[in-house]
Regions:
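Short, basic, low-complexity termini and linkers enriched in Ser/Thr/Gly/Pro
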Residues: 1-8
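Acidic, metal-coordinating catalytic segment for phosphate/diphosphate chemistry
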Residues: 16-54, 60
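Short beta-strand micro-motifs in enzyme catalytic cores
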Residues: 27-31, 77, 127-131
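Unchanged
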Residues: 42, 52-54, 59, 84-172, ...
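A generic structural motif
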Residues: 46-47, 71, 175
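A glycine-rich, hydrophobic loop/mini-helix early in the fold
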Residues: 50-83
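Charged phosphate-binding loop/patch that engages nucleotide di/tri-phosphates or the phosphate backbone
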Residues: 176-193
Length: 200
């Protein structure tokens, strides 16, 4: 029988902890730790002060809005599911609503949390919740000259293919699309949303 998460004791002991770098968005921590009473060893990790959020919008034709931008760190242009971040402790759904409006101009009447994913649990504390939004009310997005975005609408199943083929790059967006596709196939979605997705 598999152990439940609540039954598993923390095997890590922290011997010492040092903040090697600190900025408004994250800390880099260098700890000395022991696993299950073993030898002491160094462990470096990124401790986030902000979390990311993913807001997957579905319009009245069953299409997904994608946003595109040139990512400095990756040195490439990417298509992504809308999203952003906020300080830890703020309401993720409030953040998702704000990011959807900022990046697409849309407001949504209905929201459903799809999942919550760990980005890179071996080195980072970041957790990204993902939502699907429908019943969209369209408006002109307030473009930020410091963050130029391209936008395109694609049928839902085309977006799933893009996620599987690597054309959509952000991991939270890929996970949100695949989670929504699985829930659609299993009949585990509100009927109104399922009807929209089957239009595309």
């Amino acid at each position: 029988m598999e152990s439940q998460q609540s039954d598993i004791m923390n095997p890590w002991s922290v011997i010492s902890s040092h903040t090697a770098f600190d900025c408004p968005y994250f800390q880099i921590r260098q700890d000395v730790v022991s696993l299950a009473g073993g030898a002491a060893r160094s462990y470096s990790s990124v401790r986030m002060k902000y979390y990311g959020v993913c807001a997957l919008p579905i319009d009245e034709k069953g299409r997904v809005t994608l946003v595109g931008q040139y990512r400095y760190v990756l040195d490439r242009f990417t298509w992504e599911v809308p999203g952003g971040g906020a300080a830890i402790g703020t309401d993720p759904l409030v953040t998702a609503r704000a990011e959807l409006k900022e990046e697409t101009g849309c407001r949504a009447e209905h929201w459903l949390k799809l999942m919550e994913g760990m980005v890179s649990p071996g080195v980072s504390s970041e957790i990204v919740p993902a939502y699907v939004a429908w019943g969209l009310v369209h408006a002109q997005p307030a473009d930020d000259p410091q963050e130029p975005l391209s936008r395109r609408w694609v049928p839902f199943h085309r977006a799933v293919d893009m996620a599987l083929g690597g054309e959509i790059a952000n991991l939270a967006g890929v996970a949100a699309l695949l989670a929504l596709d699985v829930r659609l196939r299993r009949g585990n979605l509100p009927q109104a949303l399922a009807r929209l997705l089957r239009k595309a």
